[in-house]
Amino acid sequence: MAVDSREKGKRGEYQVRDILRERTGLEWERVPGSGAFGQSHGLKGDIYLPPQSGHISKYCFEVKWYKDDNISSNLFNVGESTLEKWWQQCSREGEQMNSKPALIFKKDRGQWLIALDSSDPMVDNLMSRTHMVLNKKDMEIVIGLFEPWLHHASVEDLIK
């Protein structure tokens, strides 16, 4: 049975939204249309805090869910890897929103991972556990497990 990648992406965004809601008690939402709506309403990323929540996220959360383990291909080659392309999108949208980029991604049947810029103070929550650092071209990111990172973050760490 073929999988609709848009539906899969939407399910992933809802999963991450629900994890954020459960941990923070805030009413995080999925950006309607995940991009299409955002283009005309100034929203970037996939998950945000709506104005009626009374809060603004410090992070531009971009969510990716992939099937094949091709994320590491080209990491050490001249070409761009899938991970680098995702990070560029997340960074660009974060800059447009005046927010920090936070890429949340997973492989089928895997755990949610998070990638943060190495200069982000919240990387300390990643560095104290199993993690990896990717330094290539003009990016240096730290990757670790999303849920333990979030568990050790306070609401104040996530909102402006």
From Swiss-Prot:
The keyword Lipid biosynthesis does not apply. It comes from the Viruses. Keywords: Early protein. Induction: Expressed in the early phase of the viral replicative cycle. It holds the Pfam family PDDEXK_15. Gene3D superfamilies: 3.40.1350.10. InterPro entries: D14-like, tRNA_endonuc-like_dom_sf. GO terms for molecular function: nucleic acid binding. This is Protein D14. It comes from Escherichia phage T5 (Enterobacteria phage T5). The lineage of its organism: Viruses, Duplodnaviria, Heunggongvirae, Uroviricota, Caudoviricetes. The gene is D14.
